[in-house]
Amino acid sequence: MSDDARFQQLNCWLDSCLPELFVAEGWGEVPPAELIPASSDASFRRYFRWQGGDRSLVVMDAPPPQEDCRPFVKVAGLLAGAGVHVPRILAQDLENGFLLLSDLGRQTYLDVLHPGNADELFEPALDALIAFQKVDVAGVLPAYDEAVLRRELQLFPDWYLARHLGVELEGETLARWKRICDLLVRSALEQPRVFVHRDYMPRNLMLSEPNPGVLDFQDALHGPVTYDVTCLYKDAFVSWPEPRVHAALNRYWKKATWAGIPLPPSFEDFLRASDLMGVQRHLKVIGIFARICHRDGKPRYLGDVPRFFRYLETAVARRPELAELGELLASLPQGAEA
């Protein structure tokens, strides 16, 4: 279906569901409104803002078969039940991939973050993280298991090395890569398992009341406890000095331990697990950004790849067990991270 036909279908759905919604919510008559693009992301989803009078709603367009709204609806219920501020689902057409949502605002954390307000904004983000980590999702959400971890890691050699750089791993280099993957997967699987958002980063946190409004949670899994907090402070689009990251991770570790979240018993053990979890994610994201460029025709994400190589270099310098990863990265063509 063309974008124009899809947009027309979306408008027809809104025309059918808005009158009933306005009656149910006691909002009166549906006013004249406009539907304007709100955002898009690295997937096939699109978002529009419906604006009529003084009311603003958000429409998610998640076209099947590439996208499925059902996980979003399910996870939204889990998060709301934990007291996390997520969009209300006001109307839904799961078969056609349409959701009508409450509007959590127009500014993300990424839009407003700076060194002077970071602690003030991150503190409620940590509280929300701990709140949903308390939810028992074993058997409720899919497992972040070995197969998923290895499939994510494989994005790096398949899409970044082979497709983007033209580098094929073979012989001892391939053996080295396999040992790196074994180390990262083993570390992830040894961690306590909790609710994992998977993209808990400033771009997906809204400046809202209360802070933060949480978005983009549809890919949540039951997995390693360090994943989301590592993602929060080692972000795709904004970086922080290492001493600040260290202090923030220590603050999370203390708060989460006090709250009863299962964690490595010492902060040093936690920090090592976070470093290795971060490496797994950084390699995955580099591969994803290359795939988005070459498969989906969206090259802009490659501009943030150097940030992830810097994260990798920091972890390699701190962790002797990552020496083979350092050797592999050093063997790549000059300027490969650009």
UniProtKB/Swiss-Prot annotation:
Disruption-associated phenotype: Cells lacking this gene accumulate MurNAc. Deletion of this gene increases fosfomycin sensitivity. Growth rate is not affected.
Question: What processes in GO biological process is this protein linked to?
Answer: cell wall organization; peptidoglycan biosynthetic process; peptidoglycan turnover; regulation of cell shape; response to antibiotic
Q: Which InterPro entries match?
A: Aminoglycoside_PTrfase, Kinase-like_dom_sf
Assigned keywords, A-Z? Antibiotic resistance, ATP-binding, Carbohydrate metabolism, Cell shape, Cell wall biogenesis/degradation, Kinase, Nucleotide-binding, Peptidoglycan synthesis, Transferase
Cite the Pfam families for this sequence: APH
Q: Which domain of life is it from?
A: Bacteria
* Record family assignment: Belongs to the kinase AmgK family.
User: What is the designated name of this protein?
Assistant: N-acetylmuramate/N-acetylglucosamine kinase
- Give the species this sequence originates from: Pseudomonas aeruginosa (strain ATCC 15692 / DSM 22644 / CIP 104116 / JCM 14847 / LMG 12228 / 1C / PRS 101 / PAO1)
Q: Which gene encodes it?
A: amgK
